[in-house]
Design a protein with these regions (language model features):
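Beta-strand-centric surfaces of beta-sandwich/beta-rich domains
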Residues: 1-146
């Protein structure tokens, strides 16, 4: 990127927008089943489960942002809250909810808006539910690179 006196230029910003709109979307994991994330069991409702690695470090080698979470499977009828984290410090970058009940199976692509994540960052996730029964969610992520 071009900088004048160390400051971002209008050209820099236009380039980022151009790349965002015209680069192809990606999915992770690709050509594989989604990653399973599990809620806690026996520690209380709406308590986040253990962090699970969705995208390992050094996998996405360009800056990126996440636009959708693909919910591939939900284990039980419940409300699920998913939290995404990035980097070694596990900084929260997004949070969404999905419901599975007698009328909705909960499998869908949920829009999410994350900040631009640094290249080579890992992405981890955790879920919570009101049931406290160890529910699971299988997910993959749709993202764009810059």
């Amino acid at each position: 990127m071009s900088h004048i006196s160390g400051k971002e230029t209008t050209y820099d910003k236009i380039t980022v927008i151009e790349e965002h709109f015209h680069k192809p979307s990606q999915v992770y994991p690709t050509l594989a089943a989604g990653v399973q994330v599990e809620a806690t069991t026996g520690v209380g409702a709406w308590t986040l489960g253990a962090l699970v690695e969705i995208v390992p470090a050094d996998t996405i080698t360009l800056d990126f942002d996440i636009h959708h979470v693909c919910i591939e499977a939900l284990s039980a009828n419940s409300v699920y809250e998913l939290v995404l984290y990035s980097g070694a410090g596990d900084t929260e970058i997004g949070r969404v909810r999905v419901v599975k009940n007698a009328n909705l199976d909960g499998t869908m692509n949920i829009p999410i808006q994350t900040p631009i994540v640094a290249a080579n960052s890992r992405i981890r996730a955790a879920i919570a539910t009101p049931a406290d029964d160890g529910e699971t969610m299988d997910i993959s992520l749709f993202y764009h690179t810059y």
